[in-house]
Amino acid sequence: MNNGTKLYMLVEEKPIGIVSVTKGLIEDLYILPDMQNMGHGTKLLLYAVGQCTDTPTLWILENNINAERLYRRIGFKETGRKNAITNKLDEIEFALT
């Protein structure tokens, strides 16, 4: 996985989700809106974690409460690192420790 991998989730042969994994960095986790709140995001995230070769980390926008809830439920914790996206919005790093 040194160059990164995109993982797709299919339901009845239709793509409903995607996530990218590069070493330990998990990015772009997305589940179609009409397929959310059914456990698909959790399953895809857990699979992505299993593909990581380094400590699983990810970044979320500070106002993305739903994503934060999912990541915390799996065991991710804030690392204390932040990136300013705009002067009013930060991106926060989480890691699975």
Model-found features: residue ranges?
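A short, internal acetyl-CoA/4′-phosphopantetheine-binding micro-motif in the GNAT/acyltransferase core
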Residues: 26-36, 60-61
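Conserved active-site alpha-helix within GNAT-family acetyltransferase domains
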Residues: 42-43, 63-80, 84-92
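Conserved acetyl-CoA pyrophosphate-binding loop and the N-cap/start of the following alpha-helix
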Residues: 34-35, 39-47
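Conserved GNAT-family N-acetyltransferase fold
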Residues: 16-19, 24, 29, 92
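A short helix-loop-beta-strand connector motif used in the catalytic cores of GNAT acetyltransferases and
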Residues: 1-8, 25
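Conserved GNAT acetyl-CoA-binding A-motif
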Residues: 51-63
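Conserved beta-hairpin
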Residues: 5-17
